[in-house]
Amino acid sequence: MSKAAIQFFRGVNEPVVPDIRLTRSRDGRTGQATFRFEQPAAIAPETMGDITGMWMVDEEGEMVTREVNGKFVNGTASALEAVYSWKSEQDFERFMRFAQRYADANGLGYSQSQDSDQTEGADNQQA
């Protein structure tokens, strides 16, 4: 069983664990995960090569996004932000299986944002 990993260069696991935020449409079919890596190894000065995507690799295979952007502070690369989008419930379920494996491999937990319950709170106020 292979360990779940994120790669910016194929075959090279990124050691920095990102902050990941999920958003989904109301019907749950589409959505996206935004990954933010602070000071990732992929942008270290000794790293040579262009970042052309972010690969999420686990025992089921790999998923890839080409939507990767650098964040700069005073002209120096400081972070990477990648967005992975899904267009079906099956794609979302596949992403969540990867996310669970990645969390387990890196000792991470899951927390739900308070903002996700805004409509429920509004309904309660009207009652």
UniProtKB/Swiss-Prot annotation:
Write down the superkingdom of origin. Answer: Bacteria
**Localization per record:** Cellular thylakoid membrane
The entry's cellular-component GO terms read:
photosystem II oxygen evolving complex; plasma membrane-derived thylakoid membrane
Q: Locate the compositionally biased regions of type Polar residues.
A: 109-127
Question: Where the protein is mainly located, per its record?
Answer: membrane
Q: Name one GO biological process term.
A: photosynthesis
Question: Could you tell me which residues belong to the region Disordered?
Answer: 108-127
Q: Which UniProt keywords apply?
A: Membrane, Photosynthesis, Photosystem II, Thylakoid
Presence of the UniProt keyword Thylakoid in the record:
yes
By its UniProt entry, which Pfam families does this protein fall under?
Answer: Psb28 (PF03912)
Query: What are the disulfide bonds?
Result: none
UniProt-listed Gene3D superfamilies: Photosystem II Psb28
Topological type in the membrane: Peripheral membrane protein
What quaternary structure, including any partners, is listed in this protein's UniProt entry? Part of the photosystem II complex.
Q: Which family does it belong to?
A: Belongs to the Psb28 family.
- Entry's NCBIfam families? PS_II_psb28
What's the protein called, per UniProt?
Answer: Photosystem II reaction center Psb28 protein
